[in-house]
């Protein structure tokens, strides 16, 4: 399935998913430092593996995906399949509505 097939995302639900599944390793706060994973502020429209000051794996640098709804939807299903060799240990979100909700939150929170 694709992002176009997903139900409309709910940013409030996405915020809860981010807090439960992502916030241990990522922040969305402008100007905040990186954690275990890169700061996701400004991620939409950015090329993967390019957040200044974060030490990416070679696989993350080589992928060069431009982050938007479609690429994030595919990536969040199975990060290790989307970018083999990524350092991200997250297994992924299997439910389309969870991915759509998280993307809606990220789009609002990282702009």
From Swiss-Prot:
Keywords: Acetylation, Electron transport, Heme, Iron, Metal-binding, Methylation, Mitochondrion, Respiratory chain, Transport
Keyword Metal-binding included in the entry's annotation: yes
Post-translational modifications reported in the UniProt record: Binds 1 heme c group covalently per subunit.
Sites bearing N-acetylserine, chain numbering: 1
Residues reported in the UniProt entry to bind heme c: 22, 25-26, 88
Chain positions found as N6,N6,N6-trimethyllysine: 80
InterPro entries: Cyt_c-like_dom (IPR009056), Cyt_c-like_dom_sf (IPR036909), Cyt_c_1A/1B (IPR002327)
Domain of life the protein comes from: Eukaryota
MF terms in GO: electron transfer activity; heme binding; metal ion binding
Pfam families associated with the record: Cytochrom_C
Entry keyword annotation includes Cell wall biogenesis/degradation: no
Subcellular location field: Mitochondrion intermembrane space
GO cellular component: mitochondrial intermembrane space
PANTHER family in the record: CYTOCHROME C
Family: Belongs to the cytochrome c family.
Protein name, per record: Cytochrome c
Species name: Ulva intestinalis (Hollow green nori)
């Amino acid at each position: 399935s694709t992002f176009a097939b997903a139900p409309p995302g709910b940013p409030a639900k996405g915020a809860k998913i981010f807090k439960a599944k992502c916030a241990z390793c990522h922040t969305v706060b402008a100007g905040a430092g990186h954690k275990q994973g890169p700061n996701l502020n400004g991620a939409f429209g950015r090329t993967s593996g390019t957040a200044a000051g974060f030490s990416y794996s070679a696989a993350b640098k080589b992928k060069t995906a431009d982050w938007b709804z479609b690429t994030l939807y595919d990536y969040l299903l199975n990060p290790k399949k989307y970018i083999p060799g990524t350092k991200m240990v997250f297994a992924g979100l299997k439910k389309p509505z969870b991915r759509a909700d998280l993307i809606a939150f990220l789009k609002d929170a990282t702009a």
